[in-house]
From Swiss-Prot:
<dbReference type="GO" id="GO:0019631">
    <property type="term" value="P:quinate catabolic process"/>
</dbReference>
<dbReference type="GO" id="GO:0008652">
    <property type="term" value="P:amino acid biosynthetic process"/>
</dbReference>
<comment type="pathway">
    <text>Metabolic intermediate biosynthesis; chorismate biosynthesis; chorismate from D-erythrose 4-phosphate and phosphoenolpyruvate: step 3/7.</text>
</comment>
<feature type="site" description="Transition state stabilizer">
    <location>
        <position position="19"/>
    </location>
</feature>
<comment type="function">
    <text>Catalyzes a trans-dehydration via an enolate intermediate.</text>
</comment>
<comment type="similarity">
    <text>Belongs to the type-II 3-dehydroquinase family.</text>
</comment>
<dbReference type="GO" id="GO:0009073">
    <property type="term" value="P:aromatic amino acid family biosynthetic process"/>
</dbReference>
<feature type="binding site">
    <location>
        <position position="79"/>
    </location>
    <ligand>
        <name>substrate</name>
    </ligand>
</feature>
<dbReference type="Pfam" id="PF01220">
    <property type="entry name" value="DHquinase_II"/>
</dbReference>
<feature type="active site" description="Proton acceptor">
    <location>
        <position position="24"/>
    </location>
</feature>
<feature type="binding site">
    <location>
        <position position="110"/>
    </location>
    <ligand>
        <name>substrate</name>
    </ligand>
</feature>
<feature type="binding site">
    <location>
        <position position="73"/>
    </location>
    <ligand>
        <name>substrate</name>
    </ligand>
</feature>
<keyword id="KW-0456">Lyase</keyword>
<dbReference type="GO" id="GO:0003855">
    <property type="term" value="F:3-dehydroquinate dehydratase activity"/>
</dbReference>
<feature type="active site" description="Proton donor">
    <location>
        <position position="99"/>
    </location>
</feature>
<dbReference type="InterPro" id="IPR018509">
    <property type="entry name" value="DHquinase_II_CS"/>
</dbReference>
<protein>
    <recommendedName>
        <fullName>3-dehydroquinate dehydratase</fullName>
        <ecNumber>4.2.1.10</ecNumber>
    </recommendedName>
</protein>
Length: 146
């Protein structure tokens, strides 16, 4: 496998499938990651995954990765984490921002993202399918001639 993508999932996403399924869907994070691993395998891309409720663990994973692309669902850190933004900018790895729900159709405090202005693209409101869209876009970019 010639390319590697880091999938980063932030706080409370470990509760997918039981936390507000009307907003976030019924799939668990393990289900979503398993589907993404299949998609990556078909494209001959390695997918590395981390989920943490601790900001520093996500930052450390970003600092340590040798991936060429990142897909991140910062979850609640979207609206609060300058440190996570700085980690992404510090490693200078292109990234896609993903949200299960349409954050712009929710509470006003969820409308602001510390990541969107630096992301290649933002995908929100498509549920778990948003991850699939992001992975397909990341793979396509990685396979483009330099």
């Amino acid at each position: 496998m010639s390319h590697k993508i880091l999938l980063v999932n932030g706080p409370n996403l470990n509760l997918l499938g039981r936390r507000e399924p009307s907003v976030y869907g019924h799939q668990t994070l393990a289900d979503i990651v398993a589907e993404l691993n299949q998609q990556a395998k078909l494209a001959e891309v390695e997918l590395e995954h981390i989920q943490s409720n601790a900001e520093f663990e996500l930052i450390n994973a970003i600092h340590a990765t040798d991936a060429q692309m990142i897909i991140i669902n910062p979850a609640a850190f979207t609206h609060t984490s300058v440190a996570l933004r700085d980690a992404l900018l510090g490693v200078a790895i292109p990234f896609f921002e993903v949200h299960l729900s349409n954050v712009h159709a929710r509470e006003a405090f969820r409308h602001h993202s510390y990541f969107s202005d630096k992301a290649i693209g933002v995908i929100c409101g498509f549920g778990s399918q948003g991850y699939e869209f992001a992975l397909a876009a990341a793979i396509k970019r990685l396979n483009q001639p330099q």
